């Protein structure tokens, strides 16, 4: 099992924690005391949406992210497993929704 450094950024504030490759980024954040938004925990609702600025994740169960947004770096932290050190912008639910479905009504 590999361990990686994860930096999460929200509103200009940065927090860093370690994440094991066999644990989701969200679970690792919670274990480190980093509070991130989440709801369904199954990769569907997009509450935990984030955008990867650098690094790679494996997210085979991210049903809430289409192929094109995934290519642009969007991920769902509840089902994203780190495969390298990561730098991530969090709280991207509205942005991801707009990208996939247009502006929320």
UniProtKB/Swiss-Prot annotation:
Its cofactor is [2Fe-2S] cluster. [2Fe-2S] cluster binds at residues 40, 45, 48, 78. Keywords: 2Fe-2S, Electron transport, Iron, Iron-sulfur, Metal-binding, Transport. Gene3D superfamilies: 3.10.20.30. One of its GO terms (molecular function) is electron transfer activity. CDD domains: fer2. Coiled coil: none annotated. Belongs to the 2Fe2S plant-type ferredoxin family. This is Ferredoxin-2. The lineage of its organism: Bacteria, Bacillati, Cyanobacteriota, Cyanophyceae, Synechococcales. The gene is petF2.
């Amino acid at each position: 099992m590999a361990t990686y450094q994860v930096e999460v950024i929200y509103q200009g504030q940065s927090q860093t924690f370690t994440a094991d490759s066999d644990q989701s980024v969200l679970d690792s954040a919670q274990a480190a005391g980093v509070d991130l938004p989440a709801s369904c925990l199954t990769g569907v609702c997009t509450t935990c949406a984030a955008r990867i600025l650098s690094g790679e994740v494996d997210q085979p169960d991210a049903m809430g992210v289409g192929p094109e947004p995934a290519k642009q770096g969007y991920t769902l932290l509840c089902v994203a497993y780190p495969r390298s050190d990561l730098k991530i912008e969090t709280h991207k639910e509205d942005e991801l929704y707009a990208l996939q479905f247009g502006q929320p009504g």
